[in-house]
Every structure is written in structure tokens, then in C-alpha cells.
Design a protein with these regions (language model features):
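SH3/SH3-like (including bacterial SH3b) beta-barrel domains
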Residues: 89-102, 227-242, 306-321
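Bacterial N-terminal signal peptides
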Residues: 1-9
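Boundary regions of SH3-family modules and the immediately adjacent low-complexity/disordered segments
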Residues: 56-77, 119-229, 259-300, 339-379, ...
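Bacterial signal peptide processing site
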Residues: 9-15
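Exported/periplasmic cell-wall-interacting domains
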Residues: 377-379, 413-415, 425-431, 436-525
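Short, low-complexity, disordered segments immediately C-terminal to signal peptides
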Residues: 15-42, 52
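Extracytoplasmic
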Residues: 72-74, 81-83, 120-122, 256, ...
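Cell wall/extracellular polymer interaction/catalysis modules
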Residues: 314, 326-429
Length: 525
């Protein structure tokens, strides 16, 4: 059931149930430490919070981001599986307007059920819509054993990283930790693989296992019971280079270590390369810095000093760091140099990503000035501007820029005339609207490549989405299959900033134009 139709391409691809887009294969993060004189991307700068303790976000933050504030005394619906649909009326006919997720819950608007097509017990939930409570997929009993198990491993939506993540080396998933015989039947290369594991544990460098955490788990297996089969994604085989999400639970069984996936399946730990935590974050322009500023993308970039002989290099600006800029510029041949604000350092504009705000808002008001256009949109008048070639993003509230960061567009750059952007992994240009928001979303591409539980996904056109990327930290550079990648920290900030708001307890929401405003997204060169 797609959100706005079904697509499955090598770029932005089919997402299970609600549609989104899949970026291309994972790239290993390569953290760079900044010099002391510029701001690190993983630190918000002068006194701002670090990435390991990020702020909740700009607005629209529920008291309990998981939607599991169960001690408030208000009756709730509790989700025991994925995609517990929320419908506009007590009927499964028509289009859903949102959904709950495994281990989540939402308050009831009315404790009395209603009968309607598709379900005997429809319950009205906050702030709108109806959920079918059948006891299997959803329950009113917070002490339901299946729900309590699901809640234990629910996505951590109060964190930019709802799960742990890694890259598949090619693996099989199991409903229970398998016996050695079951493993041999499902994994034809098991004997050779386990021999490589033992060699690597003995200290030999085994290239095929580089990055794999071979430490034996110490946990004890638990029974995954009391939940419907729909709690699991419909795949047992994960192809190499796919990105997978998993919980904190690691167990040892049948002489092997196992990880419990985000959808409560068991995966062999020795076939997964954990991703380093991506900690890059953008700049809050209301708290940390002001425009103009510059980011450094791709690699460390030269730092210049102005001398009587001209501009000479005197060090580097670290990759993914940023600086505020002064209004002092000098032209030398084809190069333009700008002085760093409050410093004797200079940078070359061609070696930095410098966000350049539009002169006007999408409705014609002057940016940076009071809005006297008389055309201000309803709601908070939020909009986002993205430069595909520049690799940057600016978020606005009304006429004011409020956030700046780096993004990774499609690896194909700009669309080619006469070619479908999906064919070239390009990011489309134009004006779009956020039409669906999903706290996590598994994305599926051709050849069964997946990116599991991609965080902070916001659809804006067909299979294209703005979303967090946990599999690389090369922001500012073209990386995706056409979607707009941001860091998980930036993804969560933007998810909470944009309209429509994700209601408390919901995991996904469809934009309903008749009820609420939506954030405009402008994608340009």
C-alpha cells in the first residue's frame, strides 16, 4: 500500500507501505577532528550542545517522544506491530491518515468503541482518526505481554538515532536463534565463514571481516512471543551492502552471537559491520551563529593568512567544521577570499559551502525583514531551501533563516533535460510540499538492497524524501539515489521543525491540506 502510488527504482525507491526513497549504498564515515579556531560540525559551537546530548528540537516536541507516557491515567491504544493504521472514520475504506508503530501508544478520545467496516471495535484516538483494536495488532491492555515486549525494543524517538545500525555482509534472519543444523541449511557458506571468524579472532587480518565486531555476546536469548507475524518485515535474506537496524540486545546461542533486529528478528553478529555514530550537526541560527557562514565539505580545506606577498596557506579548516564570515572580501585573479569573522584567517569561496539565502520567501516577502506582504501562509510559515550543487540547506520560519546545515543530494546531481531523474540518480529541482512524515522507514531498492529503519523521513514528491542518513557522514557531497540526505541530528531537528506536526504517539502522518499547513521545500541548483 503506497502512500502516493508505488515506485521501485535504483534511486529513490519503494518503501514498505508508506512510500519514500532509498539512497544508494553505504559509505563508511570518516570523522575529522577540527582545529580549535573553527566550529566542529559535531559541536554546536560557542556553548551549544554536543551531538551526544542533542537538544530535543525546535518545536512540536511531545512530552514523551515515544508516545508511551502510560502513567497519565488516560486510556490508550497500544501497538503490537508495525503499521497500525489510523483512519479518518471508523472504517478501513478509503485512505489512512497515519499509523502507530511497534511498541508505541496513543491516547483515546473516546473510551467507547464504534462498529464499522473492517473492524468490530474502532476507537477514536488523539488528535483525530480511528484505530481498529482487535487484540492482535493493537490492544487496550498496557500489560499485554506482547505489547510489553514490543515496548522494550521500541524505536527510541527521543534520540536522533532510534536504533543501532550496521552494514550487512550478506546474512539470513531468523525468528529464533537457530540451531547449527538450521544455520547450515540457510547459510551455505557457513563452514568457511566461521573458519574466517576464528582466524580473525586469533589475530589474523581477514579482509572479508574488517570492521566486524567479533566479541562474543554475553546476553541470554529471549522468546519473541505474543506478537503477530506482521511485526517482522517480510524478508529473511539481507543482501550485502544493505544497511540494517538493530536493538541493544546481543545474545549468545549455539556457539554464535546474535543481534535482535529493529523488527525483532535474530541476525548473526559476525555478518554485520557496525556503523560509527554519525554526529555531524548543522547550526541553529537563533542560538549559535548568524549568517553568513561557511561549511567545509569533502575534505580538510586550506586556511589562509593575508601577507604583503598575498594569501598564503597556514593550516586547514577541518572537514565538516564551519566558521562565521565577515563582510571583508578580496578578489585575486579568479579567486575570491573572505575573512573569517573575529579572526585573521581567510578562506577561498571555491573551497567552502556558503549558504546564500533567497531574496524573497515563496510567497514574495523580503527575507530578513518584517513580513508586510499580506500573503503570509497559515501556521508557522515554515519553508526549506536546498542547493543541490552547493550541498547546503537553510530552514526558515517566516522571513527568518533559523537553521543551516550540509546535505547530500543525488549522486547524479541535477536532472538532465529529457531524462527521468530516477534514471540518473539526480535530485529534482522545483517547489514541493512535505506530504508525509515517518519517524522511521525501511527503504527497498532493486536487487533487494535495503536501508532499514531510515530515521526522520519526510516525503515531498513521489519516491523522493528528505531523511536522516546513518550510513555516511560525507555531507555536502553527492551521495544518494536522488533523495536529500541529512545527518540524523539534523534529520530529527528538521522533522520536528516542519509542518505538518507528527501527533504525539503517532509514527507516521499523511498531510491533510484541509486541516493543516505544510512546509514548502525549494530545491534549486
Amino acid at each position: 500500500m503506497g502512500l502516493f502510488g508505488v515506485a521501485c527504482t535504483s534511486a529513490c525507491s519503494e518503501r514498505e507501505e508508506p512510500q519514500a526513497a532509498a539512497p544508494k549504498a553505504a559509505a563508511q564515515p570518516d570523522a575529522a577532528r577540527p582545529l580549535a579556531t573553527e566550529h566542529a560540525g559535531e559541536d554546536a559551537g560557542d556553548g551549544g550542545p554536543r551531538a551526544d546530548a542533542p537538544e530535543a528540537g525546535p518545536a512540536n516536541v511531545p512530552s514523551d517522544p515515544k508516545g508511551n507516557d502510560e502513567d497519565d491515567g488516560v486510556p490508550r491504544v497500544y501497538a503490537k506491530t508495525r503499521f497500525v493504521w489510523i483512519w479518518p472514520n471508523p472504517s478501513s475504506e478509503g485512505q489512512w491518515i497515519g499509523f502507530l508503530w511497534t511498541g508505541g501508544s496513543v491516547r483515546l478520545r473516546d473510551p467507547e468503541p464504534r462498529f464499522g467496516p473492517g473492524c468490530r471495535h474502532w476507537y477514536a484516538v488523539e488528535p483525530r482518526g480511528y484505530v481498529c483494536v482487535d487484540g492482535d495488532r493493537a490492544t487496550l491492555d498496557r500489560d499485554d505481554p506482547g505489547y510489553r515486549l514490543a515496548r522494550r525494543f521500541a524505536a527510541k524517538l527521543d534520540s536522533p538515532w532510534p536504533h543501532r545500525y550496521g552494514e550487512s555482509l550478506g546474512l539470513r534472519r531468523y525468528a529464533t536463534p537457530p540451531t547449527p543444523e538450521q544455520q547450515r541449511l540457510r547459510e551455505p557458506d557457513l563452514r568457511a565463514h566461521l573458519e574466517r571468524v576464528e582466524r580473525a579472532r586469533s589475530g589474523e587480518v581477514v579482509e572479508a571481516l574488517l570492521g566486524v565486531d567479533l566479541a562474543r555476546a554475553t546476553g541470554t536469548p529471549i522468546e519473541i512471543a505474543g506478537l503477530p507475524r506482521s511485526v517482522h518485515e517480510p524478508r529473511n535474506r539481507i543482501v550485502p551492502r544493505s544497511a540494517v537496524a538493530f536493538t541493544d540486545l546481543e545474545v549468545f546461542a549455539h556457539d554464535r552471537s546474535w543481534l535482535l533486529s529493529a523488527d525483532l528478528m535474530w541476525m548473526p553478529k559476525d555478518r554485520i559491520v557496525p556503523y560509527p555514530t554519525v554526529t555531524f550537526r548543522g547550526v541553529d541560527l537563533r542560538k549559535t551563529a548568524t549568517l553568513p557562514l561557511a561549511f567545509f565539505r569533502g575534505r580538510d580545506r586550506p586556511r589562509y593568512e593575508k601577507t604583503p606577498e598575498g594569501f598564503v596557506r597556514k593550516g586547514v579548516f577541518a572537514r565538516l567544521s564551519w566558521v562565521e564570515l565577515s563582510d571583508r572580501q578580496e578578489r585575486v585573479g579568479d579567486d575570491t577570499y573572505v575573512q573569517v569573522r573575529g579572526s585573521e584567517d581567510w578562506l577561498k569561496t571555491s573551497e567552502a559551502a556558503i549558504p546564500e539565502p533567497r531574496a524573497t520567501t515563496p510567497w514574495g516577502a523580503a527575507v530578513g525583514k518584517p513580513d508586510d506582504s499580506g500573503k503570509t501562509p497559515e501556521g508557522r510559515a515554515t519553508w526549506i531551501e536546498v542547493s543541490i550543487l552547493g550541498g547546503w540547506l537553510l530552514a526558515y520560519e517566516g522571513t527568518e533563516p533559523v537553521y543551516a546545515t550540509l546535505i547530500s543530494p543525488g549522486s547524479g546531481g541535477l536532472p538532465l533535460p529529457g531524462r527521468d531523474p530516477l534514471e540518473t540518480a539526480a535530485t529534482p529541482t522545483g517547489r514541493f510540499t512535505i506530504n508525509g512524515k515517518f519517524a522511521t522507514a525501511t527503504m527497498v531498492a532493486p536487487r533487494e538492497l535495503i536501508h532499514g529503519d531510515v530515521p526522520w523521513t519526510q516525503n515531498f514528491s513521489g519516491p523522493y524524501a528528505l531523511h536522516g542518513a546513518y550510513w555516511h557522514d560525507d555531507f555536502g557531497q553527492p551521495k544518494s539515489g536522488g533523495c536529500v540526505n541529512v545527518s540524523p541530528i539534523d534529520g530529527r531537528w528538521l522533522f520536528e521543525f516542519t509542518e505538518p506536526k507528527l501527533p504525539e504517539g503517532w509514527h507516521g502522518v499523511r498531510w491533510l491540506p484541509r486541516l493543516e499547513p505544510s512546509t514548502t521545500l525549494l530545491l534549486r541548483r
